[in-house]
Amino acid sequence: MSRRCELTGKAVLTGHLVSHSNRKTKRRFLPNLCNVTLLSDTLGRSVRLRISANALRSVEHRGGLDAFLVKAGEQDLSQNARLLKREIEKKLAAAA
């Protein structure tokens, strides 16, 4: 399982750990990933995702998982999230 957010694509970054004497050694900055279960109102079921804490705040801000996925770009989403987005869009188109 990769250390990548399924909704925003946020991943591991690399940088330097700098000591007092200014020696630099490599380090990794890990994203704050959480395993969450989100409810899709359109599909009427819950979905398990591994997303960053920042993405969780964005989902809540936009009004839920469905609204977030409809607005999200395809390039940042994982394969699982892309399939969810397509399902939601199909269901919304059928309801309209």
UniProtKB/Swiss-Prot annotation:
The Gene Ontology terms for molecular function here are:
structural constituent of ribosome
Query: Which InterPro entries does UniProt cross-reference here?
Result: Ribosomal_bL28, Ribosomal_bL28/bL31-like_sf, Ribosomal_bL28_bact-type, Ribosomal_bL28_sf
Fetch the Pfam families from UniProt: Ribosomal_L28
Say which species the protein is native to: Methylobacterium sp. (strain 4-46)
Q: What is this protein called?
A: Large ribosomal subunit protein bL28
Q: Tell me a GO cellular component.
A: cytosolic large ribosomal subunit
Per the UniProt entry, what is one GO biological process?
translation
Family membership noted in the UniProt record: Belongs to the bacterial ribosomal protein bL28 family.
SUPFAM superfamilies the UniProt entry points to: L28p-like (SSF143800)
The UniProt record lists the keyword Ribonucleoprotein: yes
Q: Which UniProt keywords are given for this protein, alphabetically ordered? A: Ribonucleoprotein, Ribosomal protein
Q: Is Ribonucleoprotein tagged as a keyword?
A: yes
